Amino acid sequence: MRRSGPTGGESRIILGNYAGHLSNFGETLTLLDDTARQVARTVLTPLPSDVQLYLAVSEVMYHPAVEGAEFIELINISDVVTLDLTNVRFSAGVEFDFTGSAVTSLAPGARVLVVRDLVAFTAAYGAGLPVAGVFANGSALSNGGERIKIDDASGSTAINFSYLDVEPWPPAADGGGYSIVLKRVATGSDPGQARNWRSSALPGGSPSLSDVIPFGGGDALSYALASAPIVQRAAEQVTFSYQHRLGADEAEITAEWSRDLMAWNSEALVLIGRMPDGLGLETETWQFPAESKGFVRLRVVVAP
């Protein structure tokens, strides 16, 4: 501090500019000398903004069946905090600034939409939805996947992830009429992990609404699954398929393989297809290991 230094025998060096910026979520700063030896180290206290804590991307329609009907849905996952969206903006993927838009604050649990073309979106979904505005400067979501980044009012990163149009991302969203929906969004699910996304329950998605099926207790298998696995053989390939309920997001379904009914693993099986039926169910097809005899099971765990 200037009040205590520099004093006799001390000096202050000011260098700049440095690349990037300090994280509001806290981090460790380490000073190294020219031999990479640590000279000093300090830990910064986390001071995230409300937008960084509670704003989340909950649904993305990047390749709609109707031209121009793209949208991004955001949600305030807080139960008590209203988010001020002034100066919150998209800085990658599409261009949009909430300042002066039709929606500048977001109540607890509320959702807001940013769309590519308001006319096309209204034709597809109707009027009266909470649309903040349209993507600026002719920007649009890439059909092949891209990075989406949102900054808070201070310019710090609030949301930053990339989606793709190939497995393990939901393939039905690539022109099949479905959106991608972030599972367990209220618990802070990581949007950068493909396994945390699924196809929307119905074609067209559910802008401004949730399509989640709450778990009411009871049998986890009945909650998550709509059919038992079916094993099929074609030439040298053996597969099994099952239907699960899109929106049963509180359940984790894992396909597992064993040669002896003792040791089970999921790495030996290969997911070769996912196909929603347009009525809220999706069929997954998995391939058995080549030239192998063994057993398969589905393990269903409901998150606490």
Regions found by a protein language model. Give the residues of each.
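Activation on beta-sandwich/Ig-like modules and their edge loops
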Residues: 1-193, 200-214
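Short, composition-biased motifs enriched in small/polar/acidic residues
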Residues: 200-304
